[in-house]
Curated annotation (Swiss-Prot):
<comment type="similarity">
    <text>Belongs to the bacterial ribosomal protein bL32 family.</text>
</comment>
<protein>
    <recommendedName>
        <fullName>Large ribosomal subunit protein bL32</fullName>
    </recommendedName>
</protein>
<keyword id="KW-0687">Ribonucleoprotein</keyword>
<dbReference type="InterPro" id="IPR011332">
    <property type="entry name" value="Ribosomal_zn-bd"/>
</dbReference>
<dbReference type="Pfam" id="PF01783">
    <property type="entry name" value="Ribosomal_L32p"/>
</dbReference>
<dbReference type="GO" id="GO:0015934">
    <property type="term" value="C:large ribosomal subunit"/>
</dbReference>
<dbReference type="InterPro" id="IPR002677">
    <property type="entry name" value="Ribosomal_bL32"/>
</dbReference>
<feature type="region of interest" description="Disordered">
    <location>
        <begin position="1"/>
        <end position="22"/>
    </location>
</feature>
<feature type="region of interest" description="Disordered">
    <location>
        <begin position="34"/>
        <end position="60"/>
    </location>
</feature>
<keyword id="KW-0689">Ribosomal protein</keyword>
<dbReference type="InterPro" id="IPR044957">
    <property type="entry name" value="Ribosomal_bL32_bact"/>
</dbReference>
<dbReference type="GO" id="GO:0003735">
    <property type="term" value="F:structural constituent of ribosome"/>
</dbReference>
<feature type="compositionally biased region" description="Basic residues">
    <location>
        <begin position="9"/>
        <end position="19"/>
    </location>
</feature>
<dbReference type="GO" id="GO:0006412">
    <property type="term" value="P:translation"/>
</dbReference>
Amino acid sequence: MAVQQNKKSPSKRGMHRSHNALVVPGIAVEPTTGETHLRHHISPNGFYRGRQVLKNKSEA
């Protein structure tokens, strides 16, 4: 089993953990429908950046 040779200081431990923070996902509001969706993703109605890119199943 691997054992560290020297104790890691609190500063180095903190630097090691600096990338472990949780990030809130970016949420956008569709200007045409007002629905929320993840950034760079299509809204549930099939709109992206103000344009309808997918047709709804009810319309097809």
